[in-house]
Amino acid sequence: MSYPDTPEQAAVIAWKGTRLVVSACAGSGKTTTLRRFAEENPTERMLYVAYNRAIRDEAEQKFPFNVICKTSHQLAWPTVGKHYSQRLVNTLRLTDVARALNSRNWLLARLTLDVLNRFMCSASAKISEELLPNQDDCKGLQPERILLSAQNIWAMMSSRQETFPVTHDTYLKIYQLSKPDLSARYTTVLFDEAQDANPVTSAIILEQPCRVVLVGDTHQQIYRFRGADNALCAPLLKCADRLWLTHSFRFGPEIAEIANRLLSLKGETHKITGKGGSDRVLTMVPRTFGHHVILHRSVCGVIRTALHWSLAGKKVFWVGGMESYKIEDLLDLYWFSIDMTERMLHDRLTREYRDYDEYLQIAEDTGDVEMKQAIFILEQFFPLPDRLTTLREQRVTTESDADVTVCTAHRGKGLEWDRVQLYDDFADILDPEMPDIKRHDEINLMYVATTRARKVLILDPILAELLAQPSAGELFPPSVES
């Protein structure tokens, strides 16, 4: 069933400029709007750049024939990537770097590798001091030595005559440095999910002489910790046209109000309007609720919930598969806690902590959420190996067979469910001592989690407290998203 374009969508579809930034709230039909834009410009040859292969494949089924859908790596492959095909590996190994440096200094190898990875994901034209680790991480190593090592390894990686391994990010970086001109093949580039763009991809897109349309939601930027860059706010777009899609067709007015309360903490003035029909916001799980998804801030929170439901005899569906939640790390912590380190699969804990008492002390001193959740699981679900056996027995691989679905908020981005519950491990965004940039990141994550719900949203205690405030925007000074 098709719906008429909203006035906001119509403005995007009718746009005729050279640079456009579309700020699209969760569930606002941004892909539909881009498809309509392409349909209204049938003589233009457009390129849709997707974040990953799955999004690219889905987009290809939706867009008309005048739109070519590619990931950034697919863009780089024909002219650059194919020349390195015999040297491709998934990740660079420390041993590869150490051999190339002819050194058994493993700290030098690791820091060199860190610099290389930062460079390949950056928009930088060369490996320079800005990519070096801080002085404390160098632990006595001269920064100049790390810099020279990284430059030498990069020279080997980028040369077609060398044999040093390369990753997919290597040839993408080489492609960006070649300053490709896409205007010979395309009149318009459509850049989706631009708020969490890899800086190297942003550099490729923003330097194009053809028309460029960037679409995304600043408030859904949740991968800053991985080095993601909000291309929607790039300096090169200072003079770009800007339009908004504020009508969400995913949820109704009640969930929209929660989203608006959250975003007002960041000083957002564009209000989301819920157009998805009737919805409800609750603070408690009803006694008879049926299947629902529980979204978490932490991986340990997911495991804790899954253990609780599994031990109650309920079937659990893990978004992304149970294996992706690193259950073995928790099992290692269990063996570490009872001083049976010979049964551990990995030695990370023994390398980083003197003993389990030190682990407990550091968790207490730092307030680290993942560490404290892990400690709670070990104490509540003892002995853990037996409980994990039940956990594996109660998992299902088809969501319709489950009593409950578990997922992290990060992994849930791009997904939606009728009934969503927020677990109580999200950060306290109302804490006045929290730094602004961290508060922004945590609000973004909570906003993403909140807007996964279509019909029913069950709040965590933090959001329940926020809802009780007369005006969330008065809690903190307005701030401008950067």
What are these regions (language model features)?
Residues 81-161, 236, 241-286, 291, ...:
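Interdomain motor-coupling "hinge/lid" segment immediately C-terminal to the ATP-binding subdomain
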Residues 332-460, 464-467:
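Conserved helicase C-terminal RecA-like lobe
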Residues 1-14, 20-21, 33, 106-188, ...:
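Accessory N-terminal region flanking or inserted into the helicase ATPase core
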Residues 46-47, 63-71, 84, 210-213, ...:
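Active-site regions of enzymes building and remodeling cell-envelope glycoconjugates
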Residues 53-120, 310-313, 317-325:
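Conserved P-loop NTPase-based nucleic-acid remodeling module centered on helicase motor cores
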Residues 43-44, 209-211, 453-455:
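A short helix->loop->beta-strand "cap" motif at the edges of active sites that frequently abuts
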Residues 23-28, 32-34, 51-57, 73, ...:
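Conserved helicase motor core of SF1/SF2 NTP-dependent helicases
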Residues 1-87, 260, 451:
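P-loop NTPase Walker
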